[in-house]
Amino acid sequence: MPMPPDDSALSLLPDHPLAAHNTFGIAARARFAARITQAAQFEALHRDPRVANLPQLVLGGGSNIVFTRDFDGVVLLDEIAGRRVVREDDDAWYVEAGGGENWHAFVAWTLEHGMPGLENLALIPGTVGAAPIQNIGAYGLEMKAYFDSLVAVELATGRRERFDAARCAFGYRDSFFKREGRGRFAIVAVTFRLPKQWTPRLGYADVTRELDARGITPEAATPRDVFDAVVAIRRAKLPDPLVLGNAGSFFKNPVIDAAQFDALRARAPDVVSYPQPDGQVKLAAGWLIDRCGWKGRALGAAAVHDRQALVLVNRGGATGADVLALARAIQADVRAQFGVELEAEPVCL
């Protein structure tokens, strides 16, 4: 009697081009690539002699990575799909999505099914599985606000583990998976808790201005109104990666203490800032970069976008080294002029 097919078996793609798998469009290559469509494939990796001893990189939408060289290992393309309501109670829906689901499509799906909450995070590039790694955020909302739990596979052992918010240790564009857990886990599913009592988050002036331009008051705004406003803002400010390669916001907004902020404001009274609950102050990195004269400037084939100084772009043929050189030049100028350190959001490999 024939053996049933092994659903965990990997089909390896040798010398695989990665330009289509990173939103910068950088033409790196991987020694091997493999498309992962189910958690069992991640769980079986450590038993596969072809890849068990190779460096491994889990890649979703490729919107948070800069390849500075070819990857001499196996790139695991996370394509695990699925969306479902796993349970609900009187207060909330608990919605699970596969790690390979497109983030924006998932947000749109929750709204279409009457489960709002994530609309401020619309149009952020990448996958559901990448969202907790970065604790993605925009327009006054971080993903952690609606996070319930996730399931991840430890690549070295194939062990499946559940992480709650405490174990994920979320920070500003940060989590356990960017620190101690970096490179160790593949996120296969994420569950979100979406409250049935919806409260709009309209603290950002860009959002209220866009609503006002549409004739919508904050009091009358629906979840769909907020979603549409955020999509319109992002499309106006950020270039389409399919047209102009980029990774969205390249730098984190730096957070400094009150004393450093007072000194900075004495030199630059119009500095754009956002007070934080702990007494620290978040600065607008785009404003700092613009003040240093970088908006629209280029180094080789890498450039600063002419409408959004926080976005670095590939004008065509840029290498990862070009992007990194531009980023370092910007960091040096901001440090020299303002005494502030800018930290890159994407992972540079």
UniProtKB/Swiss-Prot annotation:
Task: State if NADP is listed as a keyword.
Answer: yes
Catalytic reaction(s) noted: UDP-N-acetyl-alpha-D-muramate + NADP(+) = UDP-N-acetyl-3-O-(1-carboxyvinyl)-alpha-D-glucosamine + NADPH + H(+)
**GO MF term (any one):** FAD binding
Give the matching Pfam families.
FAD_binding_4, MurB_C
Localization annotation? Cytoplasm
**InterPro entries per the UniProt record, alphabetical:** FAD-bd_PCMH, FAD-bd_PCMH-like_sf, FAD-bd_PCMH_sub1, FAD-bd_PCMH_sub2, MurB, MurB_C, MurB_C_sf, Oxid_FAD_bind_N
Question: Function of this protein?
Answer: Cell wall formation.
Identify this protein by name: UDP-N-acetylenolpyruvoylglucosamine reductase
High-level lineage: Bacteria, Pseudomonadati, Pseudomonadota, Betaproteobacteria, Burkholderiales
Coding gene? Answer: murB
